[in-house]
Amino acid sequence: MRYWGKLLGLVLGVMYAPGVVGALLGLLVGHMVDRALGAKRRGFFADQQTRQSLFFRTTFQVMGHLTKAKGRVTEVDIQLASQLMDRMQLHGAARTAAQQAFREGKESHFPLRKALQEFRRVCFGRFDLIRIFLEIQLQAAFADGSLHPNERQVLYVIAEELGISRGQFDQFLRMFDGGRQFGGHGGWQGQQGGYSQSGYQRASQGPTLEDACKVLGVNSSDDSVAIKRAYRKLMGEHHPDKLVAKGLPPEMMEMAKQKAQEIQAAYDLIKREKGFK
């Protein structure tokens, strides 16, 4: 029922401030509560097709906005977007829609926060979808092997609007860094290097125990119980079929599979190095 907030507000308003003023204030507060709850209900009950469509469009809009943040869209940025569309096997109308969304995001007046708020509302209660979305945007941000200060600021806005704290975002960056050494992200970006405090450097060797721990978000000193728990959690969050059922566009299933393979490879390396099954 959409009027419980107003009714409750009316009763409380009259109780605390008898008369017309109390009733009006109560109705106003109740109306705001009804609107907030209504928005959450619409997000929770959004049908799968609506969620997939919005995920698809917002992904390319925000990607376009992000790549434009540093002042110009480079050839590498365009190649990344094109490669992503190829990987998703986008052709015909679907590819045209993705390209149009990318161009919309590049416009100076693109309402980034509004688009992200709508995306978050439709993904209500589905953090795994939000996580995949952020991982895709990180791919775009690091397409040319470096992170421009303006891109970093846009990423902070993206994280903020998606309900991700600064600490969580920094953790995502570390996990992203480790994953590049396993070929999962590198497959999208070519032979880019890893991240350090001084910037991105070209990798000169294969993945290390430290890289693998970054992927799982654990420390090398953690015991097998903690590592297995982190591994199972990540695999559950990146299960392709579950993600599609929750609203991930089917075209993006391949990316979810690659991420799951990256997590598995990191876990296998940790098991070998630490000697547990």
Curated annotation (Swiss-Prot):
Residues 1-6 are periplasmic. The chain crosses the membrane at residues 7-31. The keyword Mitochondrion does not apply. GO terms for molecular function: protein-folding chaperone binding. CDD domains: DnaJ, terB_like_DjlA. It is found in: Cell inner membrane. InterPro entries: DjlA, DjlA_DnaK_co-chaperone, DjlA_N, DnaJ_domain, J_dom_sf, TerB-like. Homodimer. The transmembrane domain is a dimerization domain. HAMAP family: DjlA. This is Co-chaperone protein DjlA. It comes from Yersinia pestis.
